[in-house]
A protein has these predicted regions:
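Hydrophobic-ligand binding "helix-grip"
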Residues: 48-95, 99-101, 124, 128-129
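Juxtamembrane/interface motifs at transmembrane-helix termini
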Residues: 36-40, 89, 114-116
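Ser/Thr-rich, low-complexity intrinsically disordered terminal regions
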Residues: 44-45
Length: 131
């Protein structure tokens, strides 16, 4: 299993950062890696890449303005994502960890670098909304 973690200090107030990250229906507007996201229920949503490739997310824990966790799965991988949000004055520290298991052995050597790239882009997209 590959594990990747990223931490960053976002120049925005905790409630605003939390609200942006959890505004799933508008992911297509601010996430550069997605074409859209579809909310299926209050515990399930699907993200679609620019090429239309779906990944399903199932909420496992939500502690408002503190912690958000979900399981994720597509044809290539299964995993778990944990997001921790901490107020630091007028800024917000984010601490995101992904644990992913590749379903196809050919993909296993590339999972860690792919996760790192995805996390870096996600944080960059969040930052763009607060710079």
């Amino acid at each position: 299993m590959a594990i990747s973690n990223i931490k960053a200090l976002i120049p925005g107030e905790l409630h605003k950062v939390w609200d942006l990250v959890l505004d799933i229906e508008n992911y297509g507007a601010w996430r550069s890696d997605l074409s859209k996201a579809e909310v299926i229920s209050d515990k399930k949503f699907i993200e679609y890449t620019k090429d239309g490739y779906p990944t399903t997310f199932t909420l496992t824990l939500a502690e408002p303005y503190r912690r958000w966790e979900f399981d994720m799965e597509n044809n290539n991988m299964t995993g778990h994502w944990t997001g921790i949000f901490t107020a630091k004055g007028d800024e917000t520290e984010i601490d995101f960890t992904e644990q992913v298991e590749a379903k196809k052995w050919l993909l296993k050597p590339f999972v860690k670098s792919y996760l790192r790239k995805q996390q870096t882009q996600f944080v960059a997209d969040i930052m763009k909304n607060f710079s």
